[in-house]
Amino acid sequence: MSQPITRENFDEWMLPVYAPAPFIPVRGEGSRLWDQQGKEYIDFAGGIAVNALGHAHPELREALNEQASKFWHTGNGYTNEPVLRLAKKLIDATFADRVFFCNSGAEANEAALKLARKFAHDRYGSHKSGIVAFKNAFHGRTLFTVSAGGQPAYSQDFAPLPPDIRHAAYNDLNSASALIDDSTCAVIVEPIQGEGGVVPASNAFLQGLRELCDRHNALLIFDEVQTGVGRTGELYAYMHYGVTPDLLTTAKALGGGFPVGALLATEECASVMTVGTHGTTYGGNPLASAVAGKVLDLINTPEMLIGVKQRHDWFVERLNTINHRYGLFSEVRGLGLLIGCVLNADYAGQAKQISQEAAKAGVMVLIAGGNVVRFAPALNVSEEEVTTGLDRFAVACERFVSGGSS
């Protein structure tokens, strides 16, 4: 008989880089999860914007099981049908001409930055290596991507960091313009800063970055790891803004919970990559590709994308009602189903405490820094689940302002 598993086992056995909740989920269906004790939670965290179709979606299970009964992996010495079908779906749905598959958002961003450096070196010379990113950004945890992310708390322990990366103020075109010049090979930006507080870019900011990149022969990289695959009510957020990047990274929701990432590129950009310039053992795995292909089939429809915008209104209307009662938030912001509630000055730094109260009340939410409570639910979350979950969130807010649950 196997040994019972408890939350304490995490503290005994795992590298202490996370501080997970005190309960362990064991089963999910749609936007509901149940823990080891049978307690139900409405899931508005979505695995950090990953579970775009909720838990255990029947068509995703079917796609996974069908491929699992055939073969699981061959390595990049061979291609496979699911990955080629997935590549064609992404190309047909976006600006891209070529796709590189990997396993995560960090890997996709790493590939994008490497491609941008090689593109600049091949076309203009090795002096053109500068990367401009933005303060409070998040692009992953590899040494290259954590350096591009503009949050020193994540990178300061790992010096020396890769050179030639500079950070401008987000949504400040003058700040970016002061850093972008003819030595810049790429600008990497999130259309909405997710980990940085759910801060949407302005249209003028992204349009201005496109113009600056064109002027200085730099590639514009959109990190759509969190905003992509329907999250904003468009398949990718660049469509919402009407600004087309040269490279786009996608992951998280692309696999609906199965690990997969991708770099989308124009033909011109992709042409500098040749056999051996980059690679990954698991990228384009047929299991991941089969699931991701079904995710795209289900999400890239007018009904689903219009529904995301409708669900945004459900959330914002109810969150504003809750805020009117308890006065916790200075702003409710975001696009589609990436929503941030910004704590007012009286409650600054206490987002984590609110998320903990929410879990006690039976609803899972995220934070984005110390001052923002973040919602990233499934794109198909039902109106009943939204109502029930936000009823529970209201209970959590009441407990928080009254000093916490007993």
From Swiss-Prot:
Cofactor(s) needed for function: pyridoxal 5'-phosphate
CDD domains: OAT_like (cd00610)
EC number(s) per entry: 2.6.1.81
Keywords: Aminotransferase, Arginine metabolism, Pyridoxal phosphate, Transferase
Pathway in which the depicted protein is active: Amino-acid degradation; L-arginine degradation via AST pathway; L-glutamate and succinate from L-arginine: step 3/5
Sites bearing N6-(pyridoxal phosphate)lysine, chain numbering: K252
GO molecular function: identical protein binding; pyridoxal phosphate binding; succinylornithine transaminase activity
GO BP terms: alpha-amino acid biosynthetic process; arginine catabolic process to glutamate; arginine catabolic process to succinate; ornithine catabolic process
Reaction equation(s) it catalyzes: N(2)-succinyl-L-ornithine + 2-oxoglutarate = N-succinyl-L-glutamate 5-semialdehyde + L-glutamate
Keyword Transferase: yes
Top EC class for this record: transferase
Transferase among keywords: yes
Similarity comment: family membership: Belongs to the class-III pyridoxal-phosphate-dependent aminotransferase family. AstC subfamily.
HAMAP family cross-referenced by the UniProt entry: ArgD_aminotrans_3, AstC_aminotrans_3
Biological role stated in the UniProt entry: Catalyzes the transamination of N(2)-succinylornithine and alpha-ketoglutarate into N(2)-succinylglutamate semialdehyde and glutamate. Can also act as an acetylornithine aminotransferase.
Protein name stated in the entry: Succinylornithine transaminase
Source organism (scientific name): Escherichia fergusonii (strain ATCC 35469 / DSM 13698 / CCUG 18766 / IAM 14443 / JCM 21226 / LMG 7866 / NBRC 102419 / NCTC 12128 / CDC 0568-73)
The gene coding this protein: astC
